[in-house]
Amino acid sequence: MSAPRPILRSSILAAGNGAPVLLLHGSASAAVMWVPAIDVLKAKFRVIAPDLVGYGRTDSWPDGCDFSVEDELRLLQPLLPREGPVHVVGHSYGGLVAMHFALAGRIALRSLTLIEPVAFFLLPHAGAHDAWMEIRALGDGYAAGIAAGETEAALRQFIDYWAGRGAWDAMDETLRAQIRRSARKIVLDFQVAFTDPGLEAVRALKCPVRVVSGGRSRAPTQHIASFLADALPSAEFEVVADANHLLPVTHPDMVAAMLLRELAE
């Protein structure tokens, strides 16, 4: 018999009416990241943006309790119509959770939009050995730093890797404090990203898929995006040439307009 799972209080942003759209944020972030997109999409859609486990106002995951992506999915499913269909959009770790949401097959999907998904388990399948070693070093080093109590150094390395050198030190202290509170959850996010559900399961995705990548992003996510675009026959692939991994943050108006255009098709 499996152990009972922790019961967490969750928080969401929701607005609008129409076909449901689920927006999933990345690690070290929160639903508020999607406010520019919500403001645009709410005119035509019912937009739901939850704080994922350990972020924003959703409870943290208890220390010492095993965690898997199923624990994220348990919080998401009650937010949506039982039968679907639903548009699902995810960025970074949220893109990974969105993939698993689609793989679980519990609710019909209208479409799946993956913006820089951190599906690191795909890198060996893609033959991207150097990118795999690079991201394993980041994830393992981050976990070791958190375990050793070196939270500030671990977060600086993590944020600077994705946002550019000096990004952590340049960040507003209020935002740094919010990220510090979620520092241990990022370790669990890496664990999910390294867990392989099987390439055949990914290839079996049947809903329309859009993959979006930043042309200035890191090699691991660029490899993942291009591999997904090739592995999924129905996938559409878009590269935003001047963007890095954080394109929903750095290019919010462009991302909002892109989603409105694509989800309305």
Task: Report each predicted region and the residues it spans.
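Conserved serine/cysteine hydrolase catalytic core
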Residues: 174-230, 236-239
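Conserved HGGG/HGGXW glycine-rich cap/lid loop of the alpha/beta-hydrolase fold
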Residues: 8-65
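A catalytic-pocket lid/entrance helix-loop region that shapes and gates access to the active site
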Residues: 118-147
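Conserved alpha/beta-hydrolase catalytic His-Asp/Glu region
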Residues: 148-185
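Glycine-rich His-Gly loop
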Residues: 23-26, 92, 214
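Catalytic histidine-centered segment of alpha/beta-hydrolase-like enzymes
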Residues: 240-256
